[in-house]
């Protein structure tokens, strides 16, 4: 009973901290002068990581098995993975924007796990025979870590596309404004006082320099995180194939979950290939990564919604 109470306490604490982190991010967007809030939000995600870690360990102790048995436990592990991904660059003193991505991802995942699922699913149950294997921890944990990494990388690529698209709109608007200026005597007089139109153009380039640096960082971290997720996915699929051979006598059965896992892995491989070709880097590779965002969620939730196939033990029903 004490473990159940402790689990509820840790769940509420972690959820509250993530909510505070998101509020902090909104404040930094409105008030740029409060620099310390950004660092505080990243520390809040680290505190969330330890809370969810305690929650999973507590559930592991009183259930007697690694907490990856059902959809609720996998969602909590996914939320834990989002927090874990943030910690690596943070402790290496790299400036990044992971907390902007991981905080909403973690709170949405945890909100759905705690509020979107029925309370019966929250109860830990005995492992079904197919899951009573030492491969459970290796296969499922690697796949969930890959989902978290690939989702973060995809969101970073989506952010890159949005910023680039807005930049192109601003440049088009600025060009159209320049075409109107020569017809206005007042504007020509103003430009003469400023000595040249080039000065205004330089100001625009200076204003967009920070945006350029941001897109470069987003592209860099998106590539690194997706590469990490691709590695986890490869390990997870290989370990799952070995486990399937032991449990069902075949390495691959083209189960719906296996099929979508293969599609997810293929998209990640295509993205990695586009990064090796300089002509395909930037926007093209970001579009491929953005496609992976939808495919990953189909892979993760698709079988659970349908409730069919060899992996249907984790379905909503």
From Swiss-Prot:
InterPro entries: Cyt_c_assembly (IPR002541), Cyt_c_biogenesis_CcsA (IPR017562), Cyt_c_biogenesis_CcsA/CcmC (IPR045062). Keywords: Chloroplast, Cytochrome c-type biogenesis, Membrane, Plastid, Thylakoid, Transmembrane, Transmembrane helix. Belongs to the CcmF/CycK/Ccl1/NrfE/CcsA family. It is found in: Plastid, Chloroplast thylakoid membrane. The chain crosses the membrane at residues 13-35, 44-64, 71-91, 143-163, 171-191, 225-245, 286-306. The keyword Transmembrane applies. The keyword Chloroplast applies. GO terms for biological process: cytochrome complex assembly. The gene is ccsA. It is a multi-pass membrane protein. HAMAP family: CytC_CcsA. One of its GO terms (molecular function) is heme binding. NCBIfam families: cytochr_II_ccsB. May interact with Ccs1. Required during biogenesis of c-type cytochromes (cytochrome c6 and cytochrome f) at the step of heme attachment. This is Cytochrome c biogenesis protein CcsA. One of its GO terms (cellular component) is chloroplast thylakoid membrane. It comes from the Eukaryota. It comes from Illicium oligandrum (Star anise).
């Amino acid at each position: 009973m004490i473990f159940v109470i402790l689990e509820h306490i840790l769940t509420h604490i972690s959820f509250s901290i993530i909510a505070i982190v998101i509020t902090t991010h909104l404040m930094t967007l409105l008030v740029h002068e409060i620099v310390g809030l950004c660092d505080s939000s990243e520390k809040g995600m680290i505190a969330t990581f330890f809370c969810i870690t305690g929650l999973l360990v507590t559930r592991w102790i009183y259930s007697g098995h690694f907490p990856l048995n059902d959809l609720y436990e996998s969602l909590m592990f996914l939320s834990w993975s989002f927090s874990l991904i943030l910690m690596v660059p943070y402790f290496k003193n790299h400036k990044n924007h992971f907390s902007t991505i991981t905080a909403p991802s973690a709170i949405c995942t945890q909100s759905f796990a705690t509020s979107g699922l029925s309370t019966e699913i929250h109860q830990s149950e005995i492992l079904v025979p197919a899951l009573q294997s030492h491969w459970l921890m290796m296969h499922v944990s690697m796949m969930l870590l890959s989902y978290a990494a690939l989702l973060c990388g995809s969101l970073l690529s989506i952010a890159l596309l949005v910023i680039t698209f807005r930049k192109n709109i601003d440049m088009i608007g600025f060009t159209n404004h320049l075409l109107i200026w020569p017809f206005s005597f007042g504007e020509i007089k103003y430009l003469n006082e400023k000595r040249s139109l080039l000065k205004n153009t330089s100001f625009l380039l200076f204003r967009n320099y920070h945006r350029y640096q941001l897109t470069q960082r987003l592209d860099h971290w998106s590539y690194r995180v997706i590469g990490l997720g691709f590695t986890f996915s490869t390990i997870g699929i290989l370990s799952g194939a070995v486990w399937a051979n032991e449990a069902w006598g075949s390495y691959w059965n083209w189960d719906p979950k296996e099929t979508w896992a293969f599609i997810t892995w293929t998209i990640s491989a295509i993205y990695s290939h586009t990064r090796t070709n300089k002509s395909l880097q930037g926007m093209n590779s970001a579009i491929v990564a953005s496609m992976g965002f939808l495919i990953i969620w189909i892979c993760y939730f698709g079988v659970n919604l349908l409730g069919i196939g060899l992996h249907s033990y984790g379905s909503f029903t």
